[in-house]
């Protein structure tokens, strides 16, 4: 006689990028094992890959393509899944900024972690000669490829590639050039042809795009000085 299946609770949350409500469940023991092994590796690429795999299993709403979600949706979704699975708080060690070495333990409640939005953030960026570029958010795959390279030179190259593949279109009052009709090589060459000032405008899109964030204050036990700590992005919450 087979063992009975125990039902799993279902929850809802709203995706920050589009306001869509989705259903999800906590992760199971087999999925927790995947995460533990990734965390023990201390390899950020393995951590993010594990997050992707677990989210695919835990998202119950049909039609949600995890690989196409913006990275900040992925991060927010994972934190909430984790909260319903193993606890509503995260234990971290943070480094005090006043001396750059003293570590202090802190507890962060998952409900206190928000996706911050910058008022100056825009996906439409004016360049020159009447041309503008419309950007799209990097997918999780692009996010992994760009952020978790161990080779500094390779990281620079992948950063350019992520910027190029995040272009949606280039346009002016009369014409529109869709990035989907261009090769990766053509897009990279176009990015490399920009002036430094134009490139900085595009970089601003990534610097101001929504991100997981939480600000806390700690006191350095050695210097007695108060420190403001800002946590940003998924990996900061597994430091």
PLM ranges: what are they?
Residues 1-239:
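Long C-terminal interaction/binding lobes of large macromolecular proteins
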């Amino acid at each position: 006689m087979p063992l009975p299946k125990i039902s799993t609770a279902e929850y809802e949350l709203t995706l920050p990028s589009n306001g869509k409500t989705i259903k999800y469940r906590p992760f199971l023991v087999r999925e927790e094992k995947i995460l533990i092994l990734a965390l023990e590796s201390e390899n950020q690429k393995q951590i993010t890959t594990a997050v992707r795999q677990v989210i695919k299993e835990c998202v119950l709403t049909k039609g949600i393509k995890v690989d196409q979600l913006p990275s900040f949706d992925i991060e927010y979704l994972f934190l909430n899944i984790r909260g319903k699975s193993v606890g509503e708080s995260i234990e971290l060690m943070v480094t005090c900024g006043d001396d750059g070495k003293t570590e202090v333990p802190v507890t962060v409640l998952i409900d206190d972690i928000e996706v911050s939005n910058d008022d100056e953030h825009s996906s439409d960026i004016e360049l020159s000669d009447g041309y503008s570029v419309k950007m799209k958010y990097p997918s999780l795959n692009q996010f992994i490829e760009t952020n978790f390279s161990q080779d500094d030179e390779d990281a620079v190259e992948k950063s350019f590639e992520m910027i190029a593949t995040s272009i949606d279109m280039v346009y002016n009052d009369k014409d529109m050039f869709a990035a989907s009709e261009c090769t990766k090589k053509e897009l990279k060459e176009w990015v490399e042809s920009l002036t430094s000032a134009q490139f900085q405008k595009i970089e601003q899109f990534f610097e101001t795009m929504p991100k997981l964030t939480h600000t806390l204050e700690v006191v350095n036990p050695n210097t007695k000085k108060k420190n403001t700590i800002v946590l940003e992005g998924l990996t900061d919450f597994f430091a």
